[in-house]
Amino acid sequence: MIKTFNINLAGQIFNINEDAYEHLSGYFNSLRTFYANEDDKDEIIRDIEARFAELFLAKGKNYIVTKEDTTEVVNMMGNPQEFDEENA
């Protein structure tokens, strides 16, 4: 049996399994760390959350988000470590 959670992402409720939740939570924690010194960090995080929500909604309403889904979206959006490489 796999644990699932209901999460609120950009005002949308999603059913997400435990592995996906941990992956997504880690990703957003790394974003918060990366943007910690930015004046508009909260807005940046909200925009990224909104994009994740859009991509998850495209998969359907009665859908459980899996780690494969979060990995796919993270790969599309990029990791904060990659942001540094792009700005170098």
What are these regions (language model features)?
Residues 1-88:
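Soluble N-terminal domains of membrane-associated systems
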